[in-house]
Amino acid sequence: MAVSATDLKESRILLYYCFTPIADPTAIMLWQKQLCESLGLTGRILISEHGINGTVGGSLHACKQYARRTREYPGFKGMEFKWSQGGAEDFPRLSVKVRDEIVSFGAPGELKVDENGVIGGGTHLKPEEVNKLVEERGDDVVFFDGRNAMEAEIGRFKNAVVPDVETTHDFIKELESGKYDWMKDKPVVSYCTGGIRCEVLSALMKNRGFEEVYQIDGGIVRYGEKYGDKGLWEGSLYVFDKRMHMEFSEEAKQLGFCKNCGAATNTFHNCENSECREQILLCEDCAADPAVTCGEC
């Protein structure tokens, strides 16, 4: 079949995950590495006994080939791929690794999966079902951010609860702290960038007594594609590539503020201290000043 000029000229980023039992993660890792190298893709792929989690970029043609060939593995047959603007240049290299977890909550033994995905996770809601739940249950609905607190500085669902966590490893301690016990009998909508973190987080929450837990199909990305900035989402979405953030429309609110001068901004920069490199929100003027640091180092 002939390849169109558009497929060769245009580039894309693919985001995907699939929870399914994998008997030999190392074999899958070697196959995925060879496949990506043959197609000229860059990005990051994690594989464990629980499944696969990846973000890759390259030509539109290469991405289409990658999605088709990855779905040939029986466990990945129904895997959904999210397409985004960008390409191989958005990632410094290709990294394909085997890990204990494809999302590092520090609880590999607690997570259970079968061919249908995570066992005991939160109920999946499509974006329109999220809005319907809020229409029906009103302020009783709690949006619970399943990302690092830093990510929520530039975008979040309206009135969301944002846990004080720096990494996903902090969530279990945070959930068990008692701070969120008031939510245990409320409808809780967990959310994250593409949905994968909430597959695990919602199961961890249910295991700890949260009675009515939901998760958004496709995460913030899918909700934003559906409603742009006319729904319940506000601000920019933090992303883990060179773009750093993305917006769903030109009407996106600017929720972040420069840590140095207070000006509105949605862009993170690395601290100028080479031994720190903490990511901090800075406006362009302050980011250009080598004297400005994160204030913690």
Curated annotation (Swiss-Prot):
Keyword field contains tRNA processing: yes
Ion transport listed as a keyword: no
Top-rank taxon: Bacteria
Catalytic center residues: 192 (cysteine persulfide intermediate)
Catalyzed reactions: uridine(34) in tRNA + AH2 + O2 = 5-hydroxyuridine(34) in tRNA + A + H2O
Catalytic activity, EC: 1.14.-.-
Domain Rhodanese stretches: 137-232
SUPFAM superfamilies, A to Z: Rhodanese/Cell cycle control phosphatase (SSF52821)
One GO process term, biological-process aspect: tRNA modification
PROSITE patterns, per database record: RHODANESE_3
Cited PANTHER family: THIOSULFATE SULFURTRANSFERASE/RHODANESE-LIKE DOMAIN-CONTAINING PROTEIN 2 (PTHR43268), THIOSULFATE SULFURTRANSFERASE_RHODANESE-LIKE DOMAIN-CONTAINING PROTEIN 2 (PTHR43268:SF6)
Entry function: Catalyzes oxygen-dependent 5-hydroxyuridine (ho5U) modification at position 34 in tRNAs.
Protein name: tRNA uridine(34) hydroxylase
